[in-house]
Every structure is written in C-alpha cells, then in structure tokens.
C-alpha cells in the first residue's frame, strides 16, 4: 500500500472505536479542493457521510484532511490505490477523456443542476460505452454554475479588453477561448488561481463561477463580472472509485451507494445554484459590478467557439459516438432541467 495512504488511513483508523472498525468497510476519499471550498462542504463531504446511512453502517467513507495528490493526479492515484475515491476536473483530463468535455463547450450550459443532469444522462446514453476513464467505477458527473469573466481593472466588454492582456484561465475551453481572443494566457488549476490573481500579474481571470471565486478567495480582486448570454463555459467534474474496491462491496451496498450517486448527485447540484445567487447578491452589495455582454461581443465569442465545438465533434466521432446527436441531447436536457 502506498506510504502516504497507509499513514493517513492509520491516523483515521486510530480515532475509530474498535467495534466500529470491525463493522465498517472504510473507504478513503481524497478531496482535491480545500475543506472550506463549497464543493467540499456542500456536495462531496455530505455525499460521503450519507454512504454510512444508506448502507446501514456497513460502508464508511473518510475524507482525507488534505489532498494526497496533485489535481492532475487524482485518476492515476485512484488506479494505483493511493486512495479509494476521488473527483477530478475534466479540464485536467483532456488527453484521455474527450467525450465528457461536452460540458465545458461554449454556449451549451444553463445551471449547475441542469447541466449536471444533462451530463449524467448524456454519459449514460452516449458516452459510457466508450469507457474513456478505464478501470474505475464512475459514480457521478457534475457541473458547476457557468463560468464568467472577472475584470480586475474594469469590465471585460469587448475583444479589445482581451487582446494583448494577461488573463488567468482554467485549462481546457476557457484557456483555448482566451488564447483565440489574443490574450496572454496563464492556465492552471483553480486551486492555483489565488496565487496568480493575488499577485496581480494578470488583468482578468476567466472560467469559474462567482461562488468559486469567493471560495478560492479571488473574488475580492475583481472590480467587474461579465456574464455571457448562453454561457461561455462551465467547470465539470467526474467522481470515481477504484474498481477493485467497488467490486469488493456487496451488491446491496453498491446499489445503496448508486441510489445517492449518478442522477441523485446531479439533482443535488441545485445547492450550488442557490449559493451562486447568494454570493452574487453579496458581491454586488460590496460594489462589484455585474454586466451582460452585448450582442456584438457575444457574436465574436461565438465565432471563436465554432472551431472548439467542431474539434469536439471530431473527437466524439473518433470514439464511435454521434457527436451532434449527443450535443443536441445535452442541450435539451440542460434546458429542461435548469
């Protein structure tokens, strides 16, 4: 067993009563985001805690107190048995996972709940057979509220505010869009955005929602927030478990865990929509200005988006998937469940 996992597991088990150790099949979940991050507090940790309830105490999930692996190493670490369960940002899986990138495409998303339901249903209907994630059990797919543009020196209200400017962007679609717009892009996982934004070496940051900016402590550096009609992109994730550990659970316990995962997990993302509304209201009260991009700016962004969407359709075809059919289905589901 990996040394770091052995050390963490030993510490966790030491705190458990002996009777509990005997009764529980204890799994270790790694949260790549900090304990105070909304994703951890509202979504991942409550789900982990609920597993003990739905399995009547037969399965327990402990959440590591801090991440045991780099953001880009979550999938590999679960495969190696460093920990049993993890979740990873799709933008850090672009080489291996092409199909699930649908949720990060420009102009396809609605709300966190709508997009999460759409992604799960699209995966089940169109993508699962491709098995892009390999030897893990996919437990949930989820999408955060749409990402926006944060201006640090005034609003981003046109291409002239991007061209030649230094912009932090999440890897994947956000960074690709900003590069196409002529920005000098600094791409890194969201967990690193604070050090980049707080250092004031960029003029703007793009890709995640206002609620995440609050959680990542970057919102206070923004003067303006620009929303894009139809939404520029969204941050999407996959939650997975080591296949051998999953197979070792009883069928009854697997079904119990599935009952709070998948579609149920996606529906629960409404909490993130509610948080987004609250944080935006509080930010406006503190003086941050919110803007809706004008038609001319949106049209220019849509032009930049076309080759990104076309590239995804080509990737889908290479995986044996009718990309246009999947994309139409995703959009319809996102709109119907917003």
Swiss-Prot record:
InterPro entries assigned: DctP_fam, TRAP_DctP_sf
GO terms, biological process: monoatomic ion transport
Compartments it resides in: Cell outer membrane
Principal subcellular localisation of the protein: membrane
Database matches in CDD domains: PBP2_TRAP_DctP1_3_4_like (cd13601)
Quaternary structure and interacting proteins, as annotated: Part of a two-component transport system composed of TsaT and TsaS.
Protein name as it appears in the record: Outer membrane transporter protein TsaT
